[in-house]
């Protein structure tokens, strides 16, 4: 008889059987069953692969900040039983300080060009939520998640007049954009600029753009630089004008803001003061130009 294997099996059996009598002796898993209620969200719900939950255990000797990603509309995850605080967010964002419940924050990707920091690409809509739950062995906990918007949307419409025939495009660059936001406190951090292309609504002289951002840095100015791009030989007349949006964006804490400006192309490029507009209509995707 192999006494070494017999003794090992006996010890293992004793350990396994002891779990039936001593809850502190071994780790038992509880099950979290979570799904999202997006009824309060106007935007299209994100695909399952863009939904994430971060788990923060309380009083347990297991790592904090473990992230779970939805691969279906409902998340079913087996993790050690106990008290947890959970943070939920959507989108493909970097999470900084993911191990710290209060310091965890989403970060937008940035690039530095000639010493200036810019948001990379286009930020997408993002929503978030937080909840607490105690998970117990063999008692699945079913939790509906009701997120709220975690980004702000800024819409800008420019009404162009004057010498518009050679106008090929409008580009805007806005300063004072927050690059990160804490998931718990929702405070904003960082400072960068973002560049956005305007699209012309067919058969009109109205050019529109929309952008999502974590918010606007309260210590920075929000200067919008509008650059006109002319066709062909008229490109020598490409110009840029600036307008201060700080009075509208500083302290702005709602989900969405829409502004309208007048731009006149003549001997000089002139831009008017912004006006807040109550309703915003997106240009349908079928009417957007194809830049490919």
How would you label these PLM feature ranges?
Residues 52-100, 167-248:
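Tryptophan-paired
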Residues 15-18:
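C-terminal motif of bacterial Sec signal peptides marking the signal peptidase cleavage site
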Residues 63-149:
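Short, low-hydrophobicity acidic/polar segments
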Residues 23-42, 146-161:
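A short, Gly/Thr-enriched small/hydrophobic beta-strand-prone motif that recurs across taxa
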Residues 42-49, 162-168:
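A short beta-turn/strand-edge loop motif at beta-sheet boundaries
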Residues 116-208:
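A sequence/structural signal for flexible, mid-protein segments enriched
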Residues 1-7:
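Bacterial N-terminal signal peptides that target proteins for export
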Residues 225-292:
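Hydrophilic extracytoplasmic domains
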């Amino acid at each position: 008889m192999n006494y070494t294997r017999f003794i090992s099996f006996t010890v293992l059996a004793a350990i396994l059987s002891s779990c039936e009598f001593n809850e502190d002796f071994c780790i038992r898993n509880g099950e979290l069953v979570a799904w999202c209620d997006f009824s309060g969200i106007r935007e299209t719900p994100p695909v399952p692969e863009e939904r994430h939950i971060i788990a923060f255990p309380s009083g347990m000797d297991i790592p904090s900040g473990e992230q779970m990603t939805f691969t279906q509309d409902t998340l079913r995850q087996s993790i050690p039983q106990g008290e947890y605080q959970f943070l939920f967010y959507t989108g493909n964002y970097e999470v900084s300080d993911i191990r710290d419940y209060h310091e965890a924050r989403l970060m937008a990707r940035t690039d530095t060009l000639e010493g200036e920091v810019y948001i990379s690409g286009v930020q997408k809509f993002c929503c978030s939520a937080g909840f607490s739950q105690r998970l117990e062995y063999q008692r699945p906990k079913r939790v509906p998640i009701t997120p709220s918007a975690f980004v702000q949307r800024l819409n800008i419409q420019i009404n162009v007049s004057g010498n518009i025939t050679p106008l090929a495009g409008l580009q805007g660059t806005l300063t004072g954009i927050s690059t990160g936001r804490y998931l718990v406190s929702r405070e904003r951090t960082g400072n960068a600029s973002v560049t956005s292309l305007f699209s012309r609504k067919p058969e009109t002289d109205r050019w529109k753009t929309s952008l999502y951002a974590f918010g606007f840095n309260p210590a920075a100015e929000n200067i919008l630089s509008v650059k006109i791009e002319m066709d062909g030989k008229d490109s020598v007349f490409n110009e840029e004008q600036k307008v201060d949006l700080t009075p509208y964006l500083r302290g702005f804490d709602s989900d969405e803001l829409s502004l309208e400006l007048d731009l006149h192309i003549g001997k000089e490029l002139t831009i008017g003061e912004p006006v807040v507009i109550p309703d915003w209509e997106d240009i349908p995707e079928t009417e957007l130009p194809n830049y490919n």
